[in-house]
Each structure stands twice: as C-alpha cells, then as structure tokens.
A protein has these predicted regions:
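Membrane-embedded alpha-helical bundles of multi-pass enzymes
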Residues: 2-215, 256, 410, 421-424, ...
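Soluble catalytic domains of enzymes that build or remodel membrane lipids, polysaccharides, and related
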Residues: 213-482
C-alpha cells in the first residue's frame, strides 16, 4: 500500500517564485484604467508571503520576478511609442521595453533582499518591508532622471486613503497601502509581528477617512470659466510640414466656438512649429480672447539663441490676458533628449524622433499670470513628480497640465498618467485643468473628483468652471520629509527588534 505524502517543503519553496511573479502581474490591475484597488493589497500580501523562509538569494530572485511582473505588464505601453510612432520594429520594441522593465525590477529585488537580510527569526518584518518600500520608491523617482510611475498609493485615490494625500502626499498613501498588504500577509501566517503593522495601517485608514472631507485651502476668487480644446490630431501626422496650416485652422476653429470670458488652454505643442514662426497667429488668437475678457495659454516649442548656440525648449506661454513663459524642466528620455546621443543617434529611428533635442528649463522659473490668477504650469509627465508640483504650487491659485498622450494610443499609459495628475490636485488642495491633444482632457476638483471630461480620440472643446484657491496643505508646507523619516524609523524599529531578539537568544 502506498501512502500519500504532503507536498515537500522544497516543492512549496519552488512555488513561491511563481507566486512572486503572479503578485507582480496582479498589481497593475489596481491602477487605472481597471481600478481594482483591492488587488494592490492582495499583490503586496502575496509578495510578502513569497519571501517567508527565503534565503537572501531566493529573495533577490523573487523580488526581481515581482518587479518584472509589475513593470512588464504595468508599463508595457512603452513599446507602443517605440513601434507605432518611433519607427522601431516590433522585434526590437518589445525586447527594449522588457529590458526597461527588467531594470526597474531591480528596486523590488533590493527591497526583498533587505527584508530577508534584516529579518527577525520569525520571518521578514512588515514594518521594515513597508518602510524600505517607500524609501526605494523615493530613490526610483530621483535616480538618473527618475521614473515615479506605479507607486502603490495611486491605486487608492478613490478610497478613504485619498484623505491622506494633503497630509503626506503619495508617500503616506503608499506607506499605509504597503503596511496594510504586509499586515494581511503576515496575519495569514498567524504571526504576532502582524500586529504593529495592522495597528499603523488602521490608524492610516482612520486618518484618511477623517480628513477626506476636510478642506485645507479656500477659494481666492469667484468661479472662473475654462475651455480646453482637444484637437485630436494623429501623432503620425502632427509633425508633417503639410499639417502646419491645418493644425492652425483646427485650433482657430475650436477656439472661435468658445463663449467670451473663458481661460482657454491649448495642449502640449498644440502647434508643431516654433513660437517665433507662429508669432503673428498666436498673438492674434491671444488678443482676440483678451478683448473678450479671456486669456490664451498654449503649449508651443520655443528656441533661444545663446551666443553661438541655439537652445530648444518644450514651453507653455500666456498669449493675451496675462503674461509668462515656462520651459519644461523634466524632459522625457529619448522623447525630448537622447542620453549618450553621440553613440545612439542614428542607430534606430526611435533615437531620432522629432523634437528630441530639448534643453531643460531652469528650476527658478516663475509661475504664469492669466486673468489675474497665478497659474502653476506642468508639461506632460512633470505632473507625476509630487515634490515639483507641491513646490511650484506654493503661490498659485490653480494647477494646469498640458500633454500629448497620442504617443501611447489606446494603452493604459494615458489613464495611469491622468490618475497621477488627479492626486496632485488632492495633495495641493487646488483645481487641476488638463488639456491634451487626444485625451484625457479633464477638469479635476481639489478632492480629486473628475468634474468634467472629454472622451478620448474626439475633436471637441471641454467647457467648465473651476475655483481659484489659496492656502497650503500640510504636504505643501512640509513635503515628503516627515513620511520619509517615518519610513526610516519603521526600518530602524525593525532592526532594533531583531537585535533585541538575537540578544535574548544568545543569553
């Protein structure tokens, strides 16, 4: 007679690497456009469980697999810009995107290694796991040019946790989210170590619920009318010389349909020509709106002669009804500048995209003035940098962000981008006006609610109202430093507990 045996420990360990990969694949479903936020908690819990009883080498592999699943799925839209609009063969675009995801996966790999390397005898500490997660997110958003995408807290924007954003920004949302997931994973093993993380997570959820309805800022003026034209010009046609006049005609026609006394915001590089070449047209449009009690703000490429060298900028300008010019600071690698261009230029079309030789703007630039309001401008993915937005919003009444997400087609990329922009409104207690070429064009209130939105891939004008705001949220005053300090304190507390446990065992 043959007796059945339970699965061996080695077999269970072999299952934990696929479990880590599965956990990573689940996490993007928690973000827009899907928004199944409980999957983020499940993803974190499964990731934490996969590290239980792991060696350091196993932890490194499982963390990397988690990151590969998360980024491989979550930013798969990168290949769309490479292939559809960058002229890169699919046989190259997919591996290049995979290589990018594999590099980003090194951050979760380091997290997993740290969690196991400094784990107490009963397994990884949920406190150290959560604290290190946040600190590595900070590093990922800063290292090289930074890639602050898919932070866990963004998945919670439509939950009670969004009330934490004015207090500690995306960092406090992420810390509470990871504490919750790690506590759930630890509780499944019936470990007492789950208790401190669970208590902190409950405090976070309670604080979010309590502060969600509160207003940290107040109206500075009466509601203002705004109009956001969405030209919906196909990306493969935008930069063709034959489209220049057609593009002018499209925006002139859309703008002519707007009633008087509106702040009109055209999207990023609305005109695919330099501002000095289109000066007469732009000034005429701005003057017409100013005479009607409105103002025009437009994205436009600009150039500036500095000595013998010409510098090119991705800019946004007020043209009538105000004043100001802002040059984009955070440039997109390969899209707006090419690292190691002496080596990479000419290798494949993706390294020679139109307008990929921009110069970054100075951090000392002033905000814009339009219709007697101070406007904080952000171009494209500048809006995903929380500290940049909180800093520039200090003396402003409203946030505006202009973008052209046509690069990413019907993928999840534009939805993730918009979700992050919404949280900037909550962090700063200000309305956010988002003007894009083909979507997502929208008006967002200071609590992150979408007040009005145009469908993607349509040519139309979004009309609405917003309220200029004044005041500062705690996050604007203090930035992310208090939460980073808390994350570090959680790591240190876990190390102290580990040392104390070892001391008791030795004695």
């Amino acid at each position: 007679m043959t007796l059945a045996h339970p699965p061996s420990a080695s077999f269970r360990h072999r299952l934990r690497s696929p479990l880590a990969l599965l956990a990573g694949l689940l996490s993007p479903l928690a973000f827009a456009p899907w928004g199944f936020w409980p999957l983020m908690l499940a993803s974190i819990a499964l990731f934490w469980l996969s590290l239980h009883s792991a060696t350091r080498r196993q932890a490194l592999l499982r963390g990397w697999l988690y990151g590969l699943g998360m980024f491989g799925f979550g930013i798969s839209w990168v290949h769309v810009s490479m292939h559809d609009h960058g002229g890169t063969p699919m046989s190259l675009a997919v591996p290049m995107t995979g290589l990018f995801a594999a590099g980003l996966a090194l951050f979760p790999a380091l997290l997993a290694w740290l969690a196991v390397r400094f784990a107490p005898q009963d397994g990884p500490s949920p406190l150290l796991f959560a604290g290190a997660w946040v600190l590595l997110d900070v590093l990922r958003g800063w290292m090289l040019t930074g890639f602050p995408w898919l932070y866990a807290g963004y998945s919670m924007i439509d939950t009670a946790l969004s009330g934490l954003a004015p207090l500690g920004g995306i960092w406090l949302l992420t810390l509470t989210t990871v504490l919750t997931g790690a506590a759930l994973g630890s509780a499944l093993l019936r470990r007492r170590a789950a208790l401190p993380a669970a208590v902190l997570a409950l405090i976070g959820w309670g604080a979010g619920l309590a502060t969600d309805p509160l207003d940290f800022t107040e109206p500075a003026a009466a509601p203002t009318r705004v109009a956001l034209p969405q030209g919906n010009i196909p990306q493969d046609l935008r930069w063709q010389l034959s489209m220049r006049q057609a593009t002018r005609d499209i925006y002139a026609e859309l703008t002519a349909s707007i009633p008087p006394e509106h702040l009109v915001i055209w999207p990023e590089s609305a005109l695919t020509e330099f501002a000095d070449d289109a000066a007469d047209f732009l000034l005429a449009q701005g003057q017409s709106l100013a005479e009607q009690g409105g103002a025009l703000i437009s994205g436009i490429p600009t150039r500036e002669q500095r000595g013998l060298q010409t510098h090119y900028f991705n800019s946004i300008a007020v043209l009538g009804g105000g004043e100001g010019l802002y040059h984009k600071q955070k440039l997109v690698p390969f899209g707006e500048f090419v690292p190691l261009q002496s080596v990479l230029r000419g290798l494949i079309p993706f390294f020679d995209l139109p307008m990929s030789s921009f110069t970054p703007g100075s951090p000392e630039q002033l905000n814009l003035l339009a219709m007697y309001m101070v406007v904080s401008p952000f171009i494209c993915y500048e809006i995903v940098y929380p500290e940049l937005v909180a800093d520039r919003a200090q003396d402003s009444n409203v946030l505006i962000t202009i973008s052209n997400d046509a690069w990413f087609g019907t993928s999840a990329g534009p939805h993730q981008h918009f979700q992050m922009a919404r949280l900037r409104a909550v962090e700063t207690g200000r309305w956010l006006l988002r003007s894009t070429n083909n979507g997502i064009t929208a008006i967002v209130d200071p609590h992150g609610a979408v007040v009005a939105q145009l469908p993607q891939f349509t040519r139309d004008v979004l009309l609405g109202e917003f309220v200029p705001m004044t005041g500062h949220t705690p996050y604007m005053r203090l930035g992310g430093t208090p939460v980073w300090g808390l994350a570090l304190a959680l790591c240190l507390s876990a190390l102290v507990r580990r040392a104390a446990t070892r001391a008791r065992v030795d004695h």
